[in-house]
Amino acid sequence: MRVATADEVEEFEAVSVRGFENEAATITPGRIHPPAILDEPRMVLWLGQVEGKPIGAAMSYRTDEAVGIFGVTTIASTRRRGYGTALTRAAMLVDSGLPSILAPSPEGEGVYRRLGYEQVGELRIWSRQT
């Protein structure tokens, strides 16, 4: 479902942390995604639910040239059931007239290849220690 309220942003953030960390992980609400993120019309947060319980998340950000898909995750106990694929499809269709791009984790590469994505380059990440 498309996140539309501050409470849903909080659920989105919590399930994102649980998906990327572990199912017992917690976070202070608004630490990563404050409710004001809903004011950004190009950003869409997606919350996957099964029987009303949050199980996964994804984000899409639309520019004039493409839709970027980020942060696709599901909690460990719900993986390998197609939920990550469904969340990615929802994010892809935010503006179906534009191509979509993403930078997959090694675990997600197979999912994205099955959805028709192709590798077009190498992502270089830079870091500066403080």
Predicted segments, located by residue:
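A conserved beta-strand-loop-helix scaffold within acyl/acetyltransferase catalytic domains
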Residues: 26-75
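Conserved active-site alpha-helix within GNAT-family acetyltransferase domains
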Residues: 85, 106-123, 129
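Short beta-strand element of the conserved SAM-dependent methyltransferase core
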Residues: 46-48, 125-128
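A short beta-loop-alpha structural element at the N-terminal edge
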Residues: 1-13
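Conserved acetyl-CoA-binding loop-helix of GNAT-fold acetyltransferases
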Residues: 70-94, 114
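Conserved GNAT acetyl-CoA-binding A-motif
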Residues: 94-105
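Helix-loop element at the rim of GNAT/NAT acetyltransferase active sites that forms part
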Residues: 14-26
